[in-house]
Amino acid sequence: MSSNKKYWKSVEELNENSSIVETLRNNEFVESIPTDEFLGDATKLGTSSTTRRDFLKYVGFTTAAASLAACEGPVIKSIPYVVQPEQIIPGVADFYATTVFDGFDFANLLVKTAEGRPIKIENNKLAGAKFTANARVHASILSLYDSMRLKESKIDAKKTTWEAVNAKVKTSLSEAKSAGKQVVLLTNTLASPSTEKLIAEFLLANPTGKHIIYDAVSESPALDAFESVFGERALANYDFSKAAVIVSVGADFLGDWQGGGYDTSFAKGRIPKNGKMSKFFQMEANMTLSGAAADKRLAMSTFNQKQALLHIYNVITGASAKVTLTEKYKIDVNKAAQQLKSAGSKGVLISGIQDKNAQLLVLAINKALSSEAFVTTGTRQIRKGSNEKVAQLIKDMKAGSVHTLIMSGVNPVYTLPDSKDFVGALKKVANSVTFSLKEDETALVSKMAVGTTHYLESWGDVAITKGTYSLTQPTIRPLFPETKQFQQALLEWNGNNANYYDYLKATASSIIAGASWNQVVHDGIFVGAIPTATFGSADFASAASALSQSKPAAGLELVLNTKTGLGDGQQANNPWLQEFPDPITRVSWDNYVTVSKVDADKLGLKNFNVANGGLNGSYVSAEVDGVKLENIPVIIQPGQAIGTVGIALGYGKKAALKEEMQVGVNAYTLYKNFNNVQSVTLTKTDGEHEFACVQLQKTLMGRGDIIKETTLDIFNNPQVKVQDWNEQPMVSIDHNPVKAVTVDLWTSFDRSVGHHFNLSVDLNACTGCGACVIACHAENNVPVVGKMEVRRSRDMHWLRIDRYYSSETSFSKDDEKKDNFDGLTGDKGSLGGFGELEIASENPQVAFQAVMCQHCNHAPCETVCPVAATSHSRQGQNHMAYNRCVGTRYCANNCPYKVRRFNWFLYNKNEEFDYHMNDDMGRMVLNPDVNVRSRGVMEKCSMCIQMTQKTILDAKRDGRVIKDGEFQTACSNACSTGALIFGDVNDKQSKVAELVEDDRMYHLLESVGTKPNVIYHVKVRNT
């Protein structure tokens, strides 16, 4: 039976005469559809007669077509070898020994290549190869594939051929000889026997020629002092492993001081063995890596550093030079001097003060001590530039005395304090030519610019210390065939038709003393007879007298420095280094002025966190002798000496950089007279700066279970139990306290079968240098996300190095304060007490802690993953199956160590993240053994499973047992201090098995019960 019920949607439908009802009957949509926006052709739209049915057909077809297309995998076209090179086996990496020296950084290297592509830098661990790669050297592999390299030659900014440049230079040399005007080679420190020989031949052929060495960051005062005492322009070497007492006055020797490379020998003396470790005093203005590692750090201005040096000189030598030392430093400086004197030959003093008189006193003190750590055998041939000669060159250029200027490895238009003066003088030079990797500031104003080869594309040699000879060999053919190596150009200008390789080989034959050329190429280094520089005489008393006349800075004292990431700025276009967080401030993508809390309060400067956790700060302008830098962001730095400020060099470049990399200010403009200390005036300006800071928590707040510390006295005291300084966390079971490590919520597997990997992190040996961070980046194809994503806490580093300050003068006092909390409120209440513990001390102790996935045996991430994308192996590694991951991020929420990283975007092949690795050339650096992750996928440290599996398979193929040390991860392989040791704990003879049983061993957040396979070692301070 039919129903008479009437259904309606609105009251208006009950009225048959309603205009609304009529409209709804004739029109499906109340409002007109904005078809103009997607159909585009508005003129034809009105005459279109397409029916709704046809329209749906077209939409349906296109939807189906798009769906079918999406089912197809991407087509990747590969070009096979016509004749496969014998030495290349697809899927098997090759390693080549080589050497890098760019005038600032030096290292003996192994270069990993895959199918002919260099993809990773590793340390050459052969005996004699003592210089290891820092973060910048590890990142230099990416600069090879920089699409903004200068790919050809240019004359007057127009593309040309090398032949045209060559002809013009030869004509210019002939004109200079006829006119009797100067021909000047302006280079960085070369330390290359073959290149120096070529230059000598060039000067012989050009009688008016000069060779002037210019280093952007000068060590001229130290060179001048050493030359006046030893008779050669070089620098002393140091072996800190031989020192029981180390006193550093303004020298960041764990950073870039005099070329760096001292962390290995320093770390040997810092790991407590047989109850002994070195005692280290650091006196400095800026907080540095060396200051962070010190047992006793004195934050003082450069003026007070000079006075401290004079006092130590008096104590060690018995002199009576006038000393004007601020009262608050006297006790600690005298303590350092007395301990240094007591150490005798086991003591050493170094200084970074840019003053010849100060450097003479350093030599006098070490001579008086007969210091074993002060090594004059095999002196350093580094940063040999002369400030006076560079200044004279500019005068000669202004006077029109220079006809031809040939530059290589330098960028004076960027790095000279008064670059406008240099540019003006350059206009008076008839011909100028620059050999450069980039069309940088100097190349742009030179009449001729020549793109040169990268060190990974070149032959070369380096003798960075006397008696050692290192070779540079190409690991790939030049990516840009029109580039020209500087040495080959010199050969042609000398009228020598030889290839530079043949010239190099002939030069080396007289140095390697009959050794096999092929063997030296294979090893990358040859060690011959090492000469010793002999102490001469100098007027040390006059030097002390002159130094005592020093005056404090008028107003604030500016101390210019170089950051661990960018150094002198040569690799400013390298996104790995731009995104690398500074070990001290934890800020990336910026330079800034560091000020003390006291000075910040006086000037009204602030740092603060906004709602999303991002760090913001004030702006200032800095003025030195009439030169002003505007809008410099401010970081309030714990440990900055009151009355001093710091700014890093190497930023503010504009030429040949992608827009994203054009960050910071150029502090070289304040580097007056090549002195890193200047009187400066700071003025607060309007605005707030947004920092990309990866660590907002500055202190431990007394949480001693994260970074455990003790003193050497307690460590050595037989009356003190290990439990007292390496306390094991307890939990309650049935109201009975038991050790947390004994409690299991899961049934444990038998892990004694096969391999079981552990990674050891020694807090005593870690200097925070960050080489491991960049090595991990390279090995595991970690993406670069840019400043704004870092600011949103979306950085992708698999390994981070946390930095903590003490709230009191030491971490032990923080713990003591926390233990004495009584109730919630009051003088000893925890509410106010924890707030105070969040504020870092004016001169805090510092601790670094490398944190990566802990590869927990009872991993909280594994239990919450709904698709089993993360799981555990019998070898102790926590695995990620990227193709199973659906991006719930439950694992990241449940990880107590916060080490998982989520791909918020598709970083690969995405123009929004154009950081080298996304263009065709940049992708050549990718490791084929590691998958490139896509959007929506979680990733983390894999404990370099591709490396461990290769080691296992290689040993299986060879039918042998794996030796201790063969198992490596990218981070452990890059660590030059021994802070990171990786291995198989089931091999009871292995180093890591020994470290697991060490009294200093503990696990991070042990009370959580995750049972990690990463172990840490208690930090011991020799206070």
Please provide the spans of the model-predicted regions.
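N-terminal export/assembly segments and adjacent metallocofactor-ligating motifs
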Residues: 1-334, 563, 587-591, 598-602, ...
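N-terminal leader/propeptide and maturation segments of large enzyme subunits in energy/redox metabolism
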Residues: 46, 477-536, 788
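A short, gly/pro- and small-residue-rich
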Residues: 256-276, 417-433, 468-469
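Short beta-alpha connecting loops at secondary-structure transitions
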Residues: 292-298, 451-457, 468-479, 922-929
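Active-site phosphate/pyrophosphate-binding segments
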Residues: 296-398, 510-517
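Hydrophobic alpha/beta core scaffold segments
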Residues: 400, 414-444, 448-457
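Flexible glycine/proline-rich, aromatic-decorated loop/lid segments
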Residues: 438-473, 796, 903-920
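Long, low-complexity segments enriched in small/aliphatic residues
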Residues: 510-586
